[in-house]
């Protein structure tokens, strides 16, 4: 995956906000998904 992140540090503030917004939208879309809930539970137990 490192290949795709080669210019990770060059992202503009606007681009970061767009990405964050998309992630939040995806997260809310999966809110009631049992698999997503299991993944979150697993992350919280670490």
Curated annotation (Swiss-Prot):
InterPro entries for the chain: SASP_SspJ
Residue numbers spanned by region Disordered: 24-46
Residue ranges crossing the lipid bilayer per the database entry: none
Reported induction: Expression is sigma G-dependent, and to a very small extent sigma F-dependent.
Biological process (GO), any one: sporulation resulting in formation of a cellular spore
Keyword match Isomerase: no
The entry's keywords: Sporulation
Protein biosynthesis recorded as keyword: no
Location within or outside the cell: Spore core
One Pfam family from the record: Spore_SspJ
Predominant localisation class: other
NCBIfam families the record matches: spore_sspJ (TIGR02863)
Annotated protein name in UniProt: Small, acid-soluble spore protein J
Organism in which the protein naturally occurs: Bacillus subtilis (strain 168)
Lineage of origin: Bacteria, Bacillati, Bacillota, Bacilli, Bacillales
Protein encoded by which gene: sspJ
